[in-house]
């Protein structure tokens, strides 16, 4: 009961208005009335005023304000690169379109019209889906803050995606690529070899320090990633909790890493840079390396050959293709790549596995 009789004969109203977003404590009021009838009327009046005030606040929230609320929470709860990505998508594709919109009047129709607008600009289905996801998250914030009762993006289907043919290098192609790199470019030989033989993500590789190499167990301790944001080198946790893992390496790869470490120490001595176990493995100057130089060099080293260049991330695909060719199972590959589930591994790489039907048919041939 929200109304109870006190010992002095009066009636107390106990009305709750939810929880304080800062302290987490319940927001409540307990006024007193002379009679039960007055108490019930007071309770109804307080609840009505609360609903009217909440509705007034909802109507006063503009779309730019809603964006600010979403980005503020995103900056606190997300990794820096994700926050920057959301900020970019919203500023480039969303904010101007809904600038003067009354968020209380945005319906499913307005959302699908916006999606149609995006498609007409020539964006790929994947890009449109990403933008729509960001828009939906903005409205999720409105629902969470009780500005809206429901998300107008609900039940808007994602556009179908056409799976592009995955590009990767086979071992003989990778060997040819490595042979194209001059002998004095040991940094690049080492970087691309580590990428091909471990399948690490680029951010994970650039965040590696010498202390992350276990020479006894022949393992790399992968527990961080990195990126450059607004000119600052930012180290973060890996993509998912499953990305924190230990990746086994072969002896030849360890020897290559040790050769590069010696060369790096000599380079640092010449430049007057301190070298230690905290030094980033693929660093070659007084600041950690950026991804773009390793991306550009792939095309540069391939330019005078008939070898088709691949993207930096395709080294990860190449590693998986190598493991599948060697007969490794999904579970092993999932753990090595740091995927959150086997389903992810199958969805991304399942088509690379050999067709078992052909193998079965060949066995039946042998019976006749």
Curated annotation (Swiss-Prot):
PROSITE patterns named in the record: CB, TYR_RECOMBINASE
Listed InterPro entries: CB, DNA_brk_join_enz, Integrase-like_cat_sf, Integrase_catalytic, Integrase_recombinase_N, Integrase_SAM-like_N, Tyrosine_recombinase_XerCD
Lineage top rank: taxon: Bacteria
Residue ranges constituting the Tyr recombinase domain according to the UniProt record: 164-362
Active site, per annotation: 201, 239, 313, 316, 339, 349
Keywords: DNA integration, DNA recombination, DNA-binding, Viral genome integration, Virus entry into host cell
Record function comment: Putative integrase that is involved in the insertion of the integrative and conjugative element ICEBs1. Required for the excision of ICEBs1 from the donor cell genome and subsequent integration in the recipient cell genome. Appears not to be transferred through the mating pore. Integration of ICEBs1 involves an attachment site in the chromosome, attB, and a site in the circular form of ICEBs1, attICEBs1.
Stated family: Belongs to the 'phage' integrase family.
Protein name, as recorded: ICEBs1 integrase
Gene: int
